Amino acid sequence: MVVGLLGNKIGMTQIFDESGNIIPVTILKVGPCVITQVKNQSKDGYDSIQIGYGNVLSKALTQPELGHLQKSNIQPLKYLKEFRINQETEFQIGQVLNVDSFTPGQLVNIQGKSIGKGFSGLQKRHNFTRGPMTHGSKNHRAPGSIGMGTTPGRVLPGKKMSGQLGNKITTIKKLKIIQINSEENILVIKGSVPGKPGNLLSIVPSA
């Protein structure tokens, strides 16, 4: 049983299926991930496992991070993430999880930080329609009305306006696994995933 794994986005390409149709796919380098901590209901109030991914020099970690890993006799790891589980008997500290936990055709949810687009306007950020471009109009890409008048006399919270676009945690659900390469720890996913090549991703089975 796999709860979740961490990996990096390598890039996108395309492959052909048995019928000769082109499938756009994303190549992911996933795992191996090491279980660094197992939490249980009696001690921690809930069941979960913490996994680590990505070798790193010890000097790149803080002393609390090093102490946490050394307590379990685990080498320094760059990323740590916790996943909830139903029961803690299946997993042990030091156990290695890799892409063999998944199967071709399985649906997964992939979470990562989207590409940052900087400060963006309403047309780009919220898909607003622009104003007239001719006939004397000066309202081309302006937001237009942003509220009522004297009542309520303020801009209501949550109003769609210009601001930061992207650079936030995004989840793409129910992506299909096309191929698995266990020797190279490669997952081939149908479609696109968040972020640029090299972006850290969390891969969990779809509910």
UniProtKB/Swiss-Prot annotation:
GO molecular function terms attached to this record: rRNA binding; structural constituent of ribosome
Upper lineage: Eukaryota, Sar, Stramenopiles, Ochrophyta, Bacillariophyta
Similarity comment: family membership: Belongs to the universal ribosomal protein uL3 family.
Function: One of the primary rRNA binding proteins, it binds directly near the 3'-end of the 23S rRNA, where it nucleates assembly of the 50S subunit.
Subunit structure: Part of the 50S ribosomal subunit.
One GO biological process term: translation
GO cellular component entries: chloroplast; cytosolic large ribosomal subunit
Keywords annotated in UniProt: Chloroplast, Plastid, Ribonucleoprotein, Ribosomal protein, RNA-binding, rRNA-binding
Coiled-coil spans in chain: none
Stretches the record annotates as Disordered: 129-148
InterPro entries (alphabetical): Ribosomal_uL3, Ribosomal_uL3_bac/org-type, Ribosomal_uL3_CS, Transl_B-barrel_sf
Gene name of this polypeptide: rpl3
Presence of keyword Flavoprotein: no
Xref: HAMAP family: Ribosomal_uL3_B
Protein name, per record: Large ribosomal subunit protein uL3c
Subcellular location: Plastid, Chloroplast
